[in-house]
């Protein structure tokens, strides 16, 4: 039976042991901080990137992996035959998925590239489910069908404590209906249809707490498969959210620091709640 290999990009927020256990290949993006280019793979140590960003004169810039890197990785993974399923962050956030498609067309490997519509742990949900099915020996059609199912039952919510990074990074245009002049404002957004859509905004910590209470009310009526919480900066609020949410899902909630790619755009003291519902 043909082995299917799973590839994703480093905007995914995932436990290193899962990557190893499920044999997932992660293609790193790069980040430029004050004219020094770092591979995202070298910035995974807790708090390392945030410190570099705080000390930098300018906002870091992220770059998608080069097309040639994708082509080489795909070629290498298929030396012994087999197929590749590459699942990447939304095209609205980065040109990574397009670079993967171009890399696939340059290689002789049998590659299918999927836009996850998400990033962070919401991307992880699709990648992990695909990798589990690949290890079970399922065919590409079955895996793609399940990945689509996971995508359609996933929600991504993000809270930021400042809009400064989103504005400077040019991402504010993709956040509909927010005035970029309101920089120091707390905003909760949902990523839906490749767009960040504001849900609530306000100036104090109550903004986040009130929204969380509303989310909890809605969760009590739904069958939740898993929840992930990601954060930038202090993990205090992330832990508080975990305590409030764990009762609504059987599987332990994973609380993880998000990577440099996401932190560049969200700034410090940002968080995300990623929810996958049962189909």
Curated annotation (Swiss-Prot):
Keywords associated with the record: Lipid-binding
InterPro entries membership = DegV (IPR003797), DegV_C (IPR043168), DegV_domain_contain (IPR050270)
| Record: residues binding hexadecanoate | 62, 94
Q: Which SUPFAM superfamilies match?
A: DAK1/DegV-like (SSF82549)
Tell me the ranges covered by the DegV domain, including all copies. 4-277
Has the keyword Chaperone been applied to this entry? Answer: no
| Superkingdom, taxonomy of origin | Bacteria
Q: Does the keyword Membrane apply?
A: no
GO terms, molecular function: lipid binding
Function of the protein: May bind long-chain fatty acids, such as palmitate, and may play a role in lipid transport or fatty acid metabolism.
What this protein is called in its record is DegV domain-containing protein spr1019
Task: Give the lineage.
Answer: Bacteria, Bacillati, Bacillota, Bacilli, Lactobacillales
